[in-house]
């Protein structure tokens, strides 16, 4: 699908060039980039000048630190102080780190703009080489794409004081045997902001996938969905509450291997401006708590319960 999309894009670009000529097409490409740069610069101008620092930790203790310096319509984002690359696959390639930065900038703009390099023109980004946000080419990175990317967004929003932390994980769940494999991700609580409480049971930031309908899941696989509901009270308490996470219980009707890749099981989503943190997530098999990253052999009758994190709250409720 990706190859086909690229080929389609190349054909359409050839059609544009044939119709309007390279000078006109190149000029409009530049206009689009200039527009993105201008809108980003205007958004930065609305932020207070000065330095804004924040740090957070992954569940295994690895630190992600950032210092953002705002000067008028320009911004410097420096991840100095972030820990070195890890021995596991929670490292995020530089491209993923830059994607998280670009996402935050587009949120700042507050209106739809084409995704292009113009958004980054008013911004200087410094990422220490060899850190977990810019590891060497031989470093493992798969989980960094879906988990660490969330924490990068959290520290950027934390430094700018824009929102409390959202659930901060994709809650990746996979199971299967020699005949089938299934993969799903679960939403959780969104962080509250100065204007409104966080949404409940949603994917945030780097994730946007949906769960399979229970009827389809139970028809195709030896699985029974026992519970799928909001995790009431898991959002942080404050002037604006954080969103609630989810509870999902799956009963296995046959033996299978089960893996869970998740975060925010140790370090809770932070609150902002005196708001309380969201509840940490939990992974349980037959009532026994599992690690945040784990693979186990499940038997028929076993029940996997995933409780996803709530979002942090904004402001003191008093």
Please place each PLM-identified region on the residue numbering:
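Glycine/proline-enriched, intrinsically flexible loops and inter-domain linkers
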Residues: 1-74, 80-318
């Amino acid at each position: 699908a990706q190859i086909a999309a690229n080929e389609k894009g190349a054909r359409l670009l050839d059609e544009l060039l044939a119709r309007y000529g390279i000078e006109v097409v190149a000029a409009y490409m530049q206009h689009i980039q200039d527009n993105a740069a201008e809108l980003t610069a205007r958004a930065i101008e609305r932020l207070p000048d000065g330095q804004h620092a924040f740090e957070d930790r992954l569940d295994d203790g690895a630190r992600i630190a950032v210092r953002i310096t705002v000067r008028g319509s320009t911004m410097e984002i420096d991840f100095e102080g972030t820990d070195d690359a890890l021995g596991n696959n929670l490292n995020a390639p530089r491209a993923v780190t830059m994607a998280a930065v670009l996402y935050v900038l587009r949120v700042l703009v507050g209106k739809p703009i084409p995704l292009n390099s113009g958004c980054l023109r008013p911004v200087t980004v410094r990422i220490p080489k060899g850190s977990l946000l810019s590891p060497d080419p031989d470093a493992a990175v798969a989980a960094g794409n879906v988990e660490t990317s969330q924490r990068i967004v959290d520290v950027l929003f934390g430094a700018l004081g824009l929102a409390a932390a959202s659930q901060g994980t994709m809650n990746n769940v996979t199971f299967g045997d020699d005949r089938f494999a299934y993969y799903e991700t679960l939403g959780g609580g969104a962080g509250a902001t100065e204007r409104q409480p966080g949404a409940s049971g949603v994917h945030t930031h780097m994730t946007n996938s949906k769960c399979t309908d229970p009827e389809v899941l139970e028809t195709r696989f030896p699985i029974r969905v026992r519970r799928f509901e909001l995790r009431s009270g898991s959002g942080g308490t404050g002037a604006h509450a954080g969103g609630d996470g989810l509870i999902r219980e799956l009963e296995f009707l046959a033996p299978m291997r089960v893996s869970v890749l998740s975060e925010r099981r140790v370090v809770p989503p932070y609150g902002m401006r005196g708001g309380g943190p969201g509840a940490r997530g939990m992974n349980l098999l037959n009532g026994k708590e599992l690690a945040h990253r784990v693979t186990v052999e499940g038997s028929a009758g076993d029940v996997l319960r995933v409780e996803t994190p709530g979002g942090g709250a904004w402001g003191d409720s008093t």
